Every structure is written in C-alpha cells, then in structure tokens.
A protein has these predicted regions:
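A glycine-rich dinucleotide-binding beta-alpha-beta segment and adjacent secondary-structure elements
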Residues: 179-196, 341-346, 393-456
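N-terminal glycine-rich phosphate/pyrophosphate-binding loop and immediately adjacent elements
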Residues: 6-139, 425
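Helical element adjacent to the flavin cofactor pocket in flavoenzyme catalytic cores
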Residues: 208-250
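Active-site-proximal substrate-binding core of FAD-dependent oxidoreductases
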Residues: 476-478
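Rossmann-like flavin
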Residues: 102-200
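A conserved FAD-binding loop/helix module that cradles the flavin
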Residues: 451-474
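Mid-domain catalytic core of redox enzymes
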Residues: 241, 245-358
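Conserved FAD/dinucleotide-binding core of flavoprotein oxidoreductases
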Residues: 115-118, 268-274, 300-302, 359-386
Length: 478
C-alpha cells in the first residue's frame, strides 16, 4: 500500500520512517524531549524485525525474525522505559542456551558462571577467568559496547574486553580452551557475528552474548516478539506520538514538513529515498556491503523436540553445529558463496516455556542457518537433518512446515537485503568507518538522519541505533 497524498499544511517536529525497534526507540526519545513525532510504517503492523505470525497453522505463534532477546533486556535505553506497563513480559528458560554434541551430552550456558564452568571439565578455570570480569561489570560493558566507538566511559573494563574482542572467535577459543566442550560453546556464540570465525573481531559478539547470558539471560517475549514493538508503540502514543501504518515511503519528499527526519533504512534504500546527496556520499552508499542471508524454517509440532540430551529441554535456544571445527568450516564457506550439508543452525523452542505460542498439547519451533546473500537454495532438508542429528525422531513430530528463504525475508522486511538480517556486515572495518566520522547517523542533507542497524552499535533488538540517532538530532536542534 502506498501512502495517500499528504496535506501540504501538515507538519510536525520530527518524522521517523520505519516502526522497527530502532525507529520506535528514536521516536520515543524525540517525544520524551517534547517534540511532536509521526512514524510511518510500510506494513500493517508495527515491529519491523520483531513480528509474530501464525505462519504454519492457526494457534501456532511464530517469530518471523528475531526470537530471543539478550540485548533487548540489556538495552541501556529500553530498560528505562515502562514497557511492562504496555504488555511486554520477559520469559526466561532455566538455561539460556544448549549446545548438544554427538556423544549425547549438551554443553550448557547456565545463568551461573560457576554452573557453566563445571560443565566444561578441564576448562572450568579458564572459562571463569575469561568471563567473570565481564559479567561482574556487565552494565558498564553494555553501556560502552552499545554505542558508537568512542572514548569508553569505563576504560579499564573496556580495554580488558577489547583485547579479547579484537581476536578471532576460533583463535580465542583455541588459545583459551583446551577441550572440545568449551571450544564448541564459544564457536556457537561467535557465530552470532555472522562472520567467518577465523576473522579478527569475530570474538566480540561471542563474548557479549556469553556475558549477557550470565548477566541478564536470553529471554523470549511472552506471546511473541511482536509484543516488543507493540509495547514501544503503545508507550509512544502516551507521549502523543502518532503512528501511520500501511504507508510505504519511497522518497522523503512524500513526508510532512519536519525539522528532522530519521530513517530506519539501510544505505541502498537511503540512496533511493533522498535526492541531492553529494556524489562522494552516493559512491560510499553504493559500496556498502551486505552480509550473508538467512534461511529460516518454522514448524508446528505435535510434541516437544525429542532431544537425545535431556538438558536441551531446559533452554529456549539451542545451537546445532557440533564441534568448533565444524562450525568454523560451515560459516567460512558461506562467505565464499558455498552452501554446506551441515550448516550451523540456531534453533528456538519458545512453546516449551511460553504456552501461548501453541495450542494445548502442541508445540512450535523455529530455526535458521546462514547462506550466501540472496541465495535461492532450499536449506530445509539440511536444517532438519541437523535437528534430527541431535534429536532422533524429530521429523516424525512435524505437523506443518513454513519456509522463509532470503527473498521472503526481504519481502517481509525491506531492510533485510538479500536476507541479511543484520543490516550489513558487522566487522571491524565497518565499525571504524562509521564511528570515526563526525556522526555515523547524520547525512549530508541537513536534518536527515539514519537510525537503522546499519549504524552503530549494529544488529540486535536493543533500539540503541535509534536512540543515538535521536540524540544526534536533538543536539542539532538545540
């Protein structure tokens, strides 16, 4: 649906395009400052990357994109908002994460560092030495990590983190740990970077996800991830913010007059939406690199997944990929344009802990793997084979399957170019390029800002890209 012609007499202080977590966070911050704000969203519902739908059968509530939210509950901005008053309830599984192995056991990321370490045999001491400082000072670390690269507020803690984060995930795992269990666990955590695990900087996301699991958990949203967007939207309305859905904005010239415009879009979309950008800036946008895509599968099940390792039933998130070596090979191949028969699979089983997700006596689950950007290869059989590998009899539980290839993810969310759910490559080069400018959010067109996950601090349902972009806009207005 295209936005109807807008009355030229309409105006407001701020306009935001895109009602995903970053767009809504930006709108909330602007409204808190007393600005009149209007948000335009192309889809009929708010949420962007946090949406929930009955993809398989009636009564089965599937998270279409993001499903588990360690950075949502940890967000320095979102946690200051009264989202619980507007329907957001976090549910924690007993353990944040399970990583089953072929020997029939599972490596568990527990809420307790000590309990996790005990599961790592001879690497218990090394694990505690690596992780405990970050967990102890989690709030300080999160505050510095979830913002543009700058002088840290807590230099001692950040330097300790940075010395390890700058390393490759595989290099850190092989140096710090001697056994296969700890190495496999960290490989799975590092794979959230969507980078080759032997590339510098890939350890950073692994460390953040690990520390978050201990400090704040990896919760799911009761009723579905959609509740996050709905709660943000509801709170925005209490601040007199307006949201217009079903409004596709192809050009900022379609928008009402405003003092500032914030765009929750990626660089290629920005290029199409804004006229008059300097040639050099246009060339930079055209050179912007998107990362691998995702191939996602959702299942309606007639019972819980029959894991060989019973511990897997204690975690809402399960990593399926086996050893460090297997995961490194799978993720590296994606960057060379290859598909693997044994992909690293990130699986969520929300209905084990949230009964609102499936009809009584039934269950749902979802999983995805990384694929080359824009891939047209159907990975369903390979994903299901990885589940079956650690849960024999899984296929017999499937009632209905729904596939979400990269093309469908992009159709449902225009920011997912080629199925890239992160908004671009999340590597050190991009971090430095975007953070060493005067502002990574401001464009050369006065009053126009970008607030998507293509800006620092990058991917994740934390709203901090939107928050920092709004702060930059407010600074200009003042």
């Amino acid at each position: 649906m295209t936005l109807p012609q807008i009355d030229a007499s309409q105006s407001c202080d701020a306009v935001v395009v895109g009602a995903g977590p970053n767009g809504l966070a930006a709108a909330v911050k602007l409204a808190q400052a007393g600005l009149s704000v209007t948000v335009f969203e192309a889809r009929s519902t708010v949420g962007g990357g946090v949406c929930t739908s009955e993809l398989t059968l009636p009564g089965f509530q599937h998270d279409v994109f993001a499903a588990v939210h360690p950075l949502g509950i940890a967000s320095p901005f979102l946690r200051t908002l009264p989202l619980a008053e507007h329907g957001l309830e976090w549910i924690h599984s007993p353990a944040p994460l399970a990583h089953p192995l072929d020997d029939g056991t599972a490596v568990m990321l527990e809420r307790s560092v000590e309990a996790t370490a005990q599961n790592l045999e001879k690497d218990a001491r090394a694990y505690k030495k690596l992780v405990e400082p970050f967990v102890k000072h989690w709030d300080d670390l999160a505050g510095d990590v979830l913002r543009p690269l700058s002088l840290p507020s807590h230099p001692l803690q950040f330097s300790r983190f940075g010395l390890r984060a700058i390393r490759s995930a595989s290099g850190l795992a092989e140096t710090v740990f001697g056994g296969p269990r700890a190495r496999a666990l960290f490989a799975g955590l590092g794979a959230h970077s969507i980078m080759p695990l032997d590339r510098l900087g890939s350890a950073a996301i692994g460390l953040v996800m690990c520390a978050a699991g201990h400090a704040v958990g990896w919760p799911i949203a009761k009723g579905g991830s959609q509740r996050i967007g709905e709660a943000l939207a509801a709170y925005l309305r209490t601040l007199n913010g307006e949201i217009v859905t079903g409004a596709t904005i192809d050009s900022i010239e379609m928008l009402p007059k405003a003092r500032v415009i914030l765009l929750d879009v990626t660089p290629w979309q920005l290029l199409r939406m804004v006229r008059g950008l300097p040639d050099g800036y246009q060339r930079k946008l055209k050179r912007y690199r998107y990362g691998p895509g995702a191939f996602k599968v959702e299942w309606a099940l007639d019972g819980p997944i029959p894991w060989r390792a019973a511990d897997c039933r204690r975690a809402a998130t399960v990593h399926l990929g086996g050893t460090l070596k297997e995961i490194v090979q799978a993720e590296s191949g994606i960057w060379r344009g290859r598909h693997t028969d044994k992909p690293f699979v990130l699986l969520t089983q929300q209905s084990l802990f949230d009964p609102t997700r499936a009809p009584e006596g039934k269950h749902m689950a979802g999983a995805y793997c990384h694929v080359p950007n824009g891939s047209g290869v159907d990975m369903t059989a390979h994903i299901e084979a990885q589940v079956e590998r650690f849960a024999p009899g899984f296929r017999d539980r499937i009632v209905k399957t729904h596939k979400l290839p990269p093309s469908e993810l992009e159709r449902l969310n225009a920011n997912c170019i080629g199925g890239d759910i992160a908004g671009g490559i999340q590597n050190l080069r991009r971090l430095l390029q975007t953070s060493l400018r005067g502002s990574p959010y401001a464009t050369p067109v006065g009053g126009v800002y970008v607030c998507s996950s293509s800006t620092p601090p990058g991917a994740g349902v934390h709203g901090m890209c939107g928050y920092h972009a709004a702060v930059a806009a407010l600074r200009r207005l003042s």
